């Protein structure tokens, strides 16, 4: 997909943004959109090959990768690795996380059990962009076998480079955090 096509999708997904936002929201948005360098990366056996492809790709782009496993193709349980990725992000050790399993569904469920995590299962560029612009997702979950290597790399690159739009979306993020606090 060309850069022009990606821009068109970003413009369609982003919609209208409110001009008037509080100073606190502006500061939080700057933090949300600062250059991401540290990535937690994990997979179960179904996502192992995709994890290795993504790891090499991101290292070549200069990202610092914390690989939490798995380190082989033997059968393992995705919640174990999803929890490791989510904890690295929630603790601040890593700025974002990527978790890959066979379909991405179970990993998304597991990651979202960790306080402070907004994991998004994405399957195309539109959902990738939406997850960042509207939801400020800090963990991406993917179904590794569902995508070819080029798609995986493009999706990850766009996800890492797409900024949070802020504006009206802050209110929604705050509502998610209120649910998380039990309110």
Sequence positions of predicted segments:
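Short, structured active-site "lid" loops
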Residues: 81-99
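Short hydrophobic/aromatic-enriched beta-strand-loop microsegments
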Residues: 62-65, 117-124
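C-terminal binding/interaction regions
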Residues: 3-11, 16-19, 28-35, 42, ...
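Glycine-rich phosphate/diphosphate-binding loop of Rossmann-like nucleotide-binding domains
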Residues: 40-65
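Compact, glycine-rich, soluble single-domain proteins
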Residues: 100-119
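A short beta-strand-loop structural module common to alpha/beta enzyme folds
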Residues: 64-75
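Structural motif
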Residues: 38, 95-98, 118-120, 137-141
């Amino acid at each position: 997909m060309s850069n022009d096509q990606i821009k068109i999708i970003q413009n369609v997904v982003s919609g209208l943004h409110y001009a008037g936002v509080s100073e606190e929201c502006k500061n939080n948005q700057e933090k949300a959109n600062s250059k991401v360098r540290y990535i937690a990366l994990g997979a179960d056996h179904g996502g192992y090959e995709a994890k290795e492809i993504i790891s090499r790709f991101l290292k070549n782009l200069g990202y610092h990768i914390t690989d939490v496993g798995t380190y082989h193709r033997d059968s393992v349980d995705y919640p174990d690795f999803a929890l490791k990725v989510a904890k690295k992000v929630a603790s601040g050790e890593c700025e974002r996380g990527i978790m890959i399993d066979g379909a991405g569904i179970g990993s998304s469920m597991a990651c979202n059990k960790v306080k402070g995590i907004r994991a998004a299962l994405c399957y195309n560029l539109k959902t990738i962009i939406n997850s960042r612009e509207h939801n400020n997702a800090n963990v991406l979950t993917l179904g590794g076998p569902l995508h070819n290597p080029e798609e995986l790399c493009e999706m990850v690159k766009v996800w890492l480079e797409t900024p949070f739009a802020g504006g009206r979306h802050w209110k929604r993020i705050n509502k998610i955090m209120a649910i998380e606090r039990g309110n």
